[in-house]
């Protein structure tokens, strides 16, 4: 092992949302003097505006720090920042595959939360060295000793030596750096072996083509070398290699153990997939690295071009986003109400929202999105089994033998005062309680089976608001269970709007339908004729609202006069409105589609 390799440390930071990952990353960058005070800004690695506004990390980022340790040596620290949100779990697993160690940041006031556990298990799966770090010890409500015990009890990590830090004030950050140097193992790998590098992220650059972020496991990669993608067998000539420090910094080569980027004028987006292995085309390696297991989308929704937007623009934008986000899936579909568009698959509601915002911001697109739905498994009378992503494709009720819906196992951690309200919420959402356990005298972990379509809708928001932000949720899909589900259609002016249809449990059809009709009544502008808005299950209308017509006062010219004259004018107006209703079409604004997504029960 060469000297440089023994002085390299690859690590990432994992934590629950808001426990201070990005702030700690900022402090490490500042402490090592990588960025001048003038250029330093908070959430330095979160370079999307969206990430800054919401205060969350969406994309993993990597950066190389140089640190002169107390033992007199200079170390190369490659930090890979990860998101904390459950929807972005696959982003976390990707960054962990490129590391040897992980810093587990736990908030000294909040303690271990549901997604802390989920991320720790990901790190344990990858055999990483996990270093617990207690953050926010400057808070008056901090209880570092109790939290240390929690980490030991719940996760089984020895945290007696865990650094107690405050990422906000910069207290004890030096301890974290020393901890990394001492406890994270240096990368293994042979510089002379054939090249083997894992693509853990990529993005599209208008000048350089697709730029791949890689972790080199074996061998060396230099400018001018011909590389081969093992998955697609495509070959490219390397135009530039380097590291992020924090901008792209070109180097002569990347060798075993390094984390950096490779540009090779790759114009075709599909030939540089995240999780693929790069090797030397003249001296290829035998086996590719074990890539990532494909992220399976949980939530589907339709994305359609809005007013005056071109279908091709939406397609190109989705293609570019897919390079950067391997979990996004899409296929073309058509809707009677909205024309040509795409059915897109996402990992969860937050993922879906973020993608929509990125399409609107980064590509300046005007898009319409339909209500999210999950994949149902339908067994027909003739024994055929079909998977339904789009409610509009659900077969006729007479053809259906049974419908099954996906069930998730949810782990919810809440303070014990809120156990009652959380149980109530889970019951409302058709949850089935498995068991509950006390983590310590203050907090409880509840295990529930919940239908996924209740979780994707707005469960997360409801949980946060009912527990005043203290509840945390982690879930994984368990399987399919038969259920009595019906398709709820919305008819506007007696015409079905397929984009508003969705599948719902029988018991929830009436309240859901009624709420949707009321919401749409407020959003659709009045027309010259009355518009009925109906919610129907099959042929049976279960709720209705009417938007009254705008009408001209036809009696304005009749001062006094005979009643029959007035009647004649009113009848004439009525006839006109009736004719209008038969031929008139109703404009449904995008706002109406969006408002239906945010129904508060």
From Swiss-Prot:
InterPro entries: EF-4, EFG_III/V, EFG_V-like, EFTu-like_2, G_TR_CS, LepA_C_sf, LepA_CTD, LepA_IV. One of its GO terms (cellular component) is plasma membrane. The keyword Transit peptide does not apply. It comes from the Bacteria. It is found in: Cell membrane. It is a peripheral membrane protein. Pfam families: EFG_C, GTP_EFTU, GTP_EFTU_D2, LepA_C. Keywords: Cell membrane, GTP-binding, Hydrolase, Membrane, Nucleotide-binding, Protein biosynthesis. GTP binds at residues 18-23, 135-138. GO terms for molecular function: GTP binding; GTPase activity; ribosome binding; translation elongation factor activity. It catalyses: GTP + H2O = GDP + phosphate + H(+). Residues 6-188 form the tr-type G domain. GO terms for biological process: positive regulation of translation. SMART domains: EFG_C (SM00838). Its EC number is 3.6.5.n1. Its main location: membrane. Required for accurate and efficient protein synthesis under certain stress conditions. May act as a fidelity factor of the translation reaction, by catalyzing a one-codon backward translocation of tRNAs on improperly translocated ribosomes. Back-translocation proceeds from a post-translocation (POST) complex to a pre-translocation (PRE) complex, thus giving elongation factor G a second chance to translocate the tRNAs correctly. Binds to ribosomes in a GTP-dependent manner. Belongs to the TRAFAC class translation factor GTPase superfamily. Classic translation factor GTPase family. LepA subfamily. This is Elongation factor 4. It comes from Clostridioides difficile (strain 630) (Peptoclostridium difficile).
């Amino acid at each position: 092992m060469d000297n440089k390799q023994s002085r390299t440390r690859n690590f990432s930071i994992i934590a629950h949302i808001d426990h201070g990952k990005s702030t700690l990353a900022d402090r490490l960058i500042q402490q090592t003097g990588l960025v001048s005070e003038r250029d330093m800004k908070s959430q330095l690695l979160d370079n999307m505006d969206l990430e800054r506004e919401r205060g969350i990390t969406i994309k993993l980022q990597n950066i190389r720090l140089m640190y002169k340790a107390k033992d007199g040596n200079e170390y190369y620290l490659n930090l890979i920042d990860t998101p904390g949100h459950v929807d972005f779990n696959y982003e976390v697993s990707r960054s962990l595959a490129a590391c040897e160690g992980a810093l587990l940041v736990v908030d000294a006031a909040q303690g271990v939360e549901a997604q802390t556990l989920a991320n720790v298990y990901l790190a344990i799966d990858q055999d990483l060295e996990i270093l617990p770090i207690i953050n926010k010890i400057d808070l008056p409500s901090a209880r570092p000793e109790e939290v240390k015990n929690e980490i030991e009890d719940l996760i089984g990590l020895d945290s007696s030596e865990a650094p107690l830090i405050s990422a906000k004030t910069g207290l004890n950050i030096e301890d974290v750096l020393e901890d990394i140097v001492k406890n994270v193992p240096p990368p293994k790998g042979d510089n002379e072996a054939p090249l083997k590098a894992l693509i853990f992220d990529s993005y599209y650059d208008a000048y350089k083509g697709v730029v791949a972020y890689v972790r080199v496991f074996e061998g060396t990669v230099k400018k001018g070398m011909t590389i081969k993608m093992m998955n697609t067998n495509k070959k490219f000539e390397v135009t530039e290699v380097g590291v992020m420090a924090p901008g792209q910094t070109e180097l002569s080569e990347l060798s075993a153990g390094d984390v950096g980027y490779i540009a090779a004028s790759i114009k075709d987006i599909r030939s540089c997939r995240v999780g693929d292995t790069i090797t030397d085309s003249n001296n290829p390696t035998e086996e590719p690295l074990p890539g990532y297991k494909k992220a399976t989308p949980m939530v589907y929704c339709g994305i359609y071009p809005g007013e005056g937007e071109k279908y091709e623009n939406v397609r190109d934008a989705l293609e570019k986003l897919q390079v950067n986000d391997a979990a996004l899936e899409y296929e073309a579909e058509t809707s009677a109400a909205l024309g040509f568009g795409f059915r897109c698959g996402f990992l969860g509601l937050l993922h879906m929202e973020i993608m929509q915002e990125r399409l609107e911001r980064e590509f300046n697109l005007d898009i319409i999105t339909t209500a999210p739905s999950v994949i149902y498994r339908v067994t027909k009378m003739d024994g055929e089994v079909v998977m339904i992503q789009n409610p509009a494709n659900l077969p006729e009720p007479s053809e259906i033998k049974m419908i099954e819906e996906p069930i998730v196992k949810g782990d919810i951690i809440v303070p014990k005062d809120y156990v009652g309200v959380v149980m109530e919420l889970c019951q409302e959402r058709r949850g089935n309680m498995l068991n509950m356990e006390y983590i310590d005298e203050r907090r409880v972990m509840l295990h529930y089976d919940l239908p996924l379509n209740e979780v994707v809708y707005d469960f997360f928001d409801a949980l946060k608001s009912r527990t005043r932000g203290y509840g945390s949720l982690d879930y994984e899909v368990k399987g399919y269970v038969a259920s009595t589900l019906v398709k709820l259609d919305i008819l506007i002016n007696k015409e079905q709007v397929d984009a508003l249809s969705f599948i719902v449990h029988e018991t929830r059809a009436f309240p859901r339908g009624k709420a949707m009709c009321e919401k749409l009544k407020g959003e659709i502008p009045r027309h010259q004729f009355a518009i009925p808005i109906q919610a129907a299950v099959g042929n049976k209308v279960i709720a209705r609202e009417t938007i009254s017509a705008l009408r001209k006062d036809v009696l304005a010219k009749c001062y006094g006069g005979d009643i029959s004259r007035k009647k004649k004018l009113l009848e004439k107006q009525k006839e006109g409105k009736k004719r209008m209703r038969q031929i008139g079409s109703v404009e449904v604004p995008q706002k109406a589609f969006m408002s239906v997504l945010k129904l508060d029960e």
